[in-house]
Amino acid sequence: MSRKRLSTYTAPPTEVTRALDELRARYEVPTAFPPEALAEAEATATSWAQDGPARLLADGARDARDLDLVTIDPPGSMDLDQAVLLERLPARSEAAGASVGDAPGSAATYRVHYAIASLATFVPPGGALDAELGRRGETIYAPDAATPLHPEVLSHGAASLLEDVDRPACLWTIDLDARGEVVSARVERALVRSRARLSYGQVQAAIDGEGTLPSSAPTDLPGLLAEIGRLRLEREVARGGISMTTPEQVIEVTAVTETEEAAEPAGADSAGGAVEPGAAEPVDSD
C-alpha cells in the first residue's frame, strides 16, 4: 500500500467535523434511524435467529449450505454481502439453466456460485423500515463516517454472510465455457453458510504463492480466481470494454495541521484483475 502525507488544510479536527456535519445537514443526509424502523430491524433479526432458516426452506428456498462459499472483503469488515465458490467442471459437462451466452448449449468448463446477502428478507414490506430504506437509498461515505443504508443489527449481524452461520441469500449459478463466455445462468433464493472469511490481501498473497488460506477455504480458490479472472478480462477486451482500477482513498485526521491520506489500490492486478472489490464477482456487468 502506498501512502503519502499531505498538509492540505490547517484546521482543528473539530472544525473539519463541523464542516462535514454542515454538509450533511445541507443535503439532508439521514442521521439516526427512526425508533420504529430500528424496532422492526431488531424484531426481524430476532425472528431469524429463532426459526428463520426453517421458514426460508419451507417457503421453497434452496438449501445450499453444502456449497463451500467464502467471503472476500477488506480486513475487519462486518457487512459481508457477497460470497463466492468457483468450480472446474468435468470435461464436456453440459450447462444447466437458461442459456444466455453467444453459444447456447456449449460445454461448460467452470461454474461460479455467487451469493448476495438477502437484506430484503429482513424488511417487512410497507413498514417503517421499508420506508426509511427508500428514503436513504444507499450508504453514503464521508471522510469521518458512513451513513448506512441498513441498521447495523442487519448489515453487520443477522443479514451479514458471516462465517459458519446460516444466512438467506440470492444465489447465482453461472456456467462459463473454456474461453470464459457465459453459457448459462440462473438465480434462486437460497440458504447459505460461508466457510471462511477472507481478505483481499490474504487471497492475493495465496495467488502470488506468498501465503496460504485457512483449511476451511477451497484449496483451488486462488488458482481458479486467477484463471477465470484472466479469461473474463480477455472477453472484456474482445468486446471493446475498458477496466479502470482506481485507488481506495482512506483519509484520517491525525493532527491539528496535518491530514494523512492513504491510497490503497482497489485490487491487485497480478492475478489478471481477479481480486479487487467487485471482482470477486467473476462475471462482470456491462
Language model features: what each stretch is:
Residues 27, 31:
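Alpha-helical structural modules in large enzymes and assemblies
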Residues 34:
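Conserved beta/loop motifs at nucleotide-recognition and modification sites
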